[in-house]
Amino acid sequence: MRHTYLISAALCIFGASAATAFEPTPDGSSLSKAFPGKSYSPYAQRGIPDRPLWGDTHLHTSTSFDAGAFGNRLDARAAYRFAKGQEVQATTGFMARLSRPLDWLVVADHSDNMGLFDMINAQDPAIMSDAEGNRIATMVANGGDEGVAAALELIDAYSRGQVLSPALAVEAGTKPFRSVWQRQIAAAEEAYEPGLFTSFIGYEWTSLIQGGNMHRVVIYRDNGQKAGMLDPFTTESPAGSINPRDLWKWMANYEQVTRGDVLALAHNGNLSNGIMFPETAQYDGTELDEEYVQTRARWEPMYEVTQIKGDGETHPFLSPNDEFADYETWDKGNLNLSELKEDSMLAGEYAREALKTGLKLEARLGTNPYKFGMVGSTDSHTSLATAQEDNFFGKHSGAEPNPQRPSHIVGQFGDVAILGWEMVASGLAAVWAAENTREAIFDAMERKEVYATTGSRIGVRFFGGWDYTMDDLTSRTPAALGYAKGAPMGGDLSAAPEGATAPNFMVYALKDPIGGNLDRIQIVKGWMDSAGETHEQVYDVVWAGDREPDANGKLPAIGSTVDVARATWTNTIGLGEMGTVWTDPDFDPSQPAFYYARVIEIPTPRWTAYDAFRMGAEVPAESPMETQERAYTSPIWYTPG
């Protein structure tokens, strides 16, 4: 402080006379001569993203009929306040707050029966005068397990293409539907603070095909004026449809009518029983054709790879040599558990296998429909976007924190039940956008410069090219060199320059500031051989400690510092940051391929350990108590040219 005062004083005393000794301020022309084509400031006219923007593409509020029936009473405005870092009272009474605010959020309430819960909650005469409507409304009003049972009954009926009563169906175009849609739009518009926080307008199109999950979130780049011009698409005939092709037609029509922009985000292929990523034909037997692959590639640039209802990167049946494949696997059956899982279904459900299938379809039909970026999100139905293990408010309001929730049934269809401990505290979406605006974030989503995490805020950069060096990585501007010399995550490798024998990849990761250290970075490669068969390989490219791969090339586990009884750990193993430049040792220029990075944290306590420690919850013996959070980048593709 003393030096500051003296300097300030000197400027005050000598400022006037000293100014006369300076050269006149140069004009623009002399500056341009001194710095031709350049600016002194390294940040001027620099349009590359300098930090990931964290958000959730998939959050439900009390407006969704199932969330409302489960007991949620928090609307979209509460969801935005919570995402901005404000303290909110959860439906069950606890005060809740994020450890750090999000940068952006998509409230994506179900378009089907939008407005139904408002009518039920208000005990609208049209509902209460109907026998089935009265019964459901009474169960919802009673709350607790009765409310959960009402929600599951409605979901089960809709999953079979049925309604319990015409009184319990709110169609697009009706006054209740439009009123709620306009309210959702207004909440998003009010919450939008360009440069500080981005609130996207969106909804979920909830297609269920004989219980098979085909859900998509629709995200708007646009403001409320455009978004309000057309009602959201639903699955209810005659105006709606359960066929994704019809959703894509609706999206094309929306853009034509409004001159706006939308995209669709599929999720939970693990609950589709094999129909999410078809290779030969759609669920109804319609053969895949050029129109299908082109249209899907046009409208679905991302896939939600991890969330509360399971992690969807890969499955141990599909990736038996990947020791990290069996992570938070949810795969008992389809969404309503009316059909149990068979191994033959798995190839059409998981992201890594879909990326491989996409190579086949591009060879056969000319376009890769599964050329998607990867994001995580919550799919929370509590209005609270919580994906952090020590701050997890569950799937729905009937599964918010309480001592019984690990062993409590959170969903049951027939004889098959899902217990609370099976919920996954996941995930988040990171976007490399230069500005925190709807336009910049949406454009980054479309170019796939995004990545997924299971809830931890791991920072990851991933670039592919032909001549990266370790000097590039250790320079003070690795990102600038990454863009200048190659393609970022979500992009395509350029044609190989003369003399290049294999692509190389620059990858760098930084731990979550309040999370676990990093165990390792892996690069996952998938490729198609000359016979049309696909393959995969996981490479450990950089890791913490002095471990050495075994005879099979496998790196030993890093160990664990987790104290389950106290729900804590120490960062005495692992590293805070790591990176490398890796060259593909098995590259064949004739084979199409993709590459993505997977970053693994050291073990930390799972949410079930926090529940046991804080609330004395009795956790079933089969429940994991530790987890290894991870990040999945979007791939970089190589196409022979």
Which residues does each PLM region occupy?
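Gram-negative bacterial Sec-dependent N-terminal signal peptides
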Residues: M1-T20
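C-terminal functional module detector
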Residues: F22-A76, Y80-A83, E87-A137, V170-G173, ...
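Long, well-ordered early-domain segments
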Residues: S111-D112, G147-T198, G212, P238-S241
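Substrate-binding cleft of extracellular glycoside hydrolase catalytic domains
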Residues: D124-R160
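Ser/Thr/Asn(+Pro)-rich, low-complexity disordered segments
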Residues: N142, N243, Y283-G285
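Active-site-proximal segments of metallohydrolase catalytic domains
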Residues: F177, E236-Q256, A266
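Long, charge-dense tracts
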Residues: I219-R221
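Conserved, charged catalytic cores of large soluble enzymes
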Residues: G224, T234-E236, G240, A325-E328
